Design a protein with these regions (language model features):
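N-terminal basic, amphipathic alpha-helical segments
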Residues: 1-129, 334, 338-344, 378, ...
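Short Gly/Ser/Thr- and Asp/Glu-enriched loop/turn motifs at secondary-structure junctions
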Residues: 61, 168, 395-399
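N-terminal small-domain helix-loop-helix segment of the aminotransferase-like
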Residues: 84-176, 183, 357, 425, ...
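Conserved core of the PLP fold type I
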Residues: 138-273, 278, 285-286, 291-300, ...
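Conserved core segment of the aminotransferase class I/II
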Residues: 301-370
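Conserved glycine-rich beta-strand-loop-beta hairpin in the small C-terminal domain of fold type I
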Residues: 370-380, 392-405
Length: 471
């Protein structure tokens, strides 16, 4: 059981036994952290889960209190809704939002990648030079699908170090994670098929569904505990679902990580209905220190989970190198890649081989995790100071996204448009859903150092939000 889960269960037992009574104030995050030996982010995650389940309530700057009516927290909650969209049409809106972010003077809180200054450009450039000098004549042929054998072996060994058995033969190197995910989707579906996605979901998933002519079954997803398995099963029972596109670690945009127990149950559910799972796992290397996470594939012994990831978030975005551990569909994915992009850049694959064998990657990851944790914590604290109590700031352990929930009558798209006038980019909730359910939400990138420029930008954004709340 994960550390945050142990704390959740411990506090539930204490509440049930009467140690904590309705209305009692729980220990502060810092005090609980010192008492339990857990990090502040782990304690915060546990408290947020208790709040989502109705055990506690929170007030900004006032801490957490035991809920006034505990009985209601033990009653089964209504399962999250499932919505369906027969014609996905979202790409044009997403394109417009992303285009606006390309302005070089823009402060990109809506950016999907980490702060580029965090990338190890010097060492990657050295690896690229070494790769160019030592590239054999046969490089082009050696790097055709499924991709460079050395690189696939390195990736397989990294999984093996976590206890995940993946053969290099089932790994296909792709031009970024999105190609890996889209090829996986093509291997499982035909135009007109139903695909389960989270709601909210990574907008790239919605774009891929639109491009491939697929129908979406959006399963409402809790910001803290993740996808509702009862609702997922209902979707699998009522529709002929051909695939599930899911994120179990540091989900974009919400930031949650499924517990290992829930991951196991999710895989068992997919196996029961014989539905392949396409797992988007691009953020799993960005966990807090000493708090590693496992992909859904870890719990799948039937090869029905297609594990997709990349180096774009953890190393450097511009390389555009990803992969899919495609299980029993590896050959089909290779054929599809051969018909579309033919192959992934051979020089870039060789660059990664040189870099990853130099042992610089682990040192870089350690520093990256530390800086992301520090920057996200500081930005979370500042947002809690700047924003009124009607705005819920959800900041969970790992990766670098913060999710803001505004009152439901607020249109985050209007806030986005006003912020653009101040050269501030944010990601409005509309980008991540095919319904209007998250139109009052905002995703922020917390990977940037909070210097005067970024602090000023957050103050401007907070002023815009307060103005909308006052209307």
């Amino acid at each position: 059981m994960a550390k945050y889960q142990e704390l959740v269960e411990q506090l539930k037992r204490q509440i049930k036994s009467g140690i904590w009574h309705p209305g009692d104030k729980l220990p502060s995050l810092r005090r609980q952290s010192e008492h339990s030996g857990l990090s502040l982010m782990t304690v915060l995650h546990a408290y947020q889960i208790l709040e989502s389940q109705g055990w506690v309530t929170s007030q900004p700057r006032s801490g957490y209190r035991v809920a006034p009516n505990i009985k209601s927290s033990n009653e089964p909650q209504a399962p999250a809704a499932v919505s369906w969209t027969e014609q996905v049409d979202i790409n044009e809106f997403i394109f417009d939002v992303l285009q606006a972010s390309k302005n070089p003077s823009m402060i990109n809180f809506g950016f999907a990648y980490p702060d580029p200054s965090l990338y190890p450009r010097y060492h990657v450039n050295r690896a690229m030079s070494a790769a160019a000098r030592n590239m054999p004549i046969s490089t082009t042929f050696d790097n055709l699908p499924p991709g460079n054998e050395q690189l696939r072996t390195i990736i397989a060994k990294r999984y093996a170090a976590k206890g995940i058995e993946i053969s290099p033969d089932e790994i296909v190197i792709t031009a970024g994670a999105l190609e890996a995910l889209t090829l996986s989707l093509q291997a499982c579906t035909r135009p007109g098929d139903w695909v389960v996605v989270e709601s909210p979901a990574f907008y790239g998933a919605l774009q891929s569904l639109e491009r491939l002519g697929l129908k979406a079954l959006s399963v409402r997803t809790d910001p803290v505990t993740g996808i509702d398995l009862d609702s997922l099963e209902r979707a699998l029972q009522t529709h002929d679902v051909k695939a599930c596109w899911l994120m179990s670690n540091f989900q974009n945009p919400l930031g949650f990580t499924l517990s290992n127990e829930k991951k196991q149950k999710l895989i068992e559910l997919a196996q029961r209905y014989n539905v392949p799972v396409i797992e988007d796992d691009v953020y799993s290397e960005l966990h807090a220190e000493n708090d590693s996470v496992y992909p859904l594939r870890m719990f799948d012994d039937m090869g029905n989970t297609m594990l997709c990831s990349s180096f774009s978030k953890s190393l450097i975005a511009g390389l555009r190198i990803g992969w899919v551990a495609a299980g029993k569909r590896a050959l089909e994915v290779q054929k599809l890649q051969l018909m579309s992009t033919l192959a992934t850049s051979a020089p870039v694959q060789m660059t990664l081989v040189h870099y990853l064998t130099s042992r610089n990657y682990e040192s870089h990851l350690k520093q990256l995790r530390k800086k992301l944790f520090e920057r996200k914590s500081k930005m979370t604290d500042l947002l809690n100071e700047l924003l009124p109590e009607e705005v819920k700031v959800l900041s969970q352990s790992g990766a670098y996204f913060i999710w803001l929930e505004l009152p439901k009558h607020i249109d985050a798209l209007q806030i986005y448009r006003e912020a653009l006038k101040d050269n501030i980019s944010i990601a409005p909730g509309k980008m991540f859903s095919l319904t209007e359910q998250y139109d009052h939400c905002i995703r922020l990138n917390a990977s940037f150092e909070l210097n005067d420029k970024y602090v000023h930008a957050l103050n401007l954004l907070a002023n815009i939000i307060r103005d909308h709340l006052a209307k």
